[in-house]
């Protein structure tokens, strides 16, 4: 899968629509061998300003010599902006690779009777994978 194919897949999922429940994301990360359990995470919550706080914290830690990875939403220009390693957005090639791996898991999930994950759930699973495959998870602080 190349970057354009990855973007076509992401866009095909649709941006809007809330489907309450954890079944989709739980099933998806299970098929991906729970990448979220392999990373140390600072999880930022709240109503407003989460992306700014995550970005500030990521840059502060990177500037102090820490290895960091950051996942934020939404993006400004490209989806790659949502996933950064040491302050640098992941490459188009890495984005395509984690999209392909996640899509395979989504296809299996649907084949097994699961409900279509939302675009946000798919991108979140992709972020977990990118932080495992691209970075050194045991040496990084992940901010999301």
Give residue ranges: language-model regions.
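Short functional linear segments
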Residues: 1-46, 53-66, 71, 110-114
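Electropositive phosphate-/nucleotide-binding environments in soluble metabolic enzymes
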Residues: 4, 19-22, 89-92, 96, ...
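N-terminal phosphate/diphosphate-binding loop that engages ATP/GTP or pyrophosphate donors
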Residues: 56-104
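ATP-dependent adenylate-handling ligase core
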Residues: 101-120
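Short acidic active-site motifs
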Residues: 127
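Feature captures the FAD/FMN-dependent oxidoreductase FAD-binding
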Residues: 130
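Single conserved hydrophobic/aromatic residue that forms the stacking wall/gate
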Residues: 133-144
């Amino acid at each position: 899968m190349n970057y354009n194919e990855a973007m076509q897949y992401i866009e095909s999922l649709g941006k809007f629509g809330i489907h309450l429940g954890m079944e989709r994301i739980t099933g998806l990360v299970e098929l991906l061998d729970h990448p979220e359990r392999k990373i140390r995470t600072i999880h930022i919550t709240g109503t407003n300003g989460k992306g700014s706080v995550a970005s500030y914290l990521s840059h502060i830690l990177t500037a102090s010599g820490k290895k960091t990875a950051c996942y934020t939403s939404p993006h400004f220009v490209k989806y790659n902006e949502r996933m950064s390693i040491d302050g640098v957005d992941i490459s188009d090639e890495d984005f395509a690779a984690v999209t392909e791996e996640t899509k395979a898991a989504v296809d299996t999930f649907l084949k097994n009777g699961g409900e279509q994950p939302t675009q946000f759930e798919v991108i979140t699973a992709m972020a977990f994978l990118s932080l495992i495959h691209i970075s050194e998870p045991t040496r990084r602080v992940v901010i999301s």
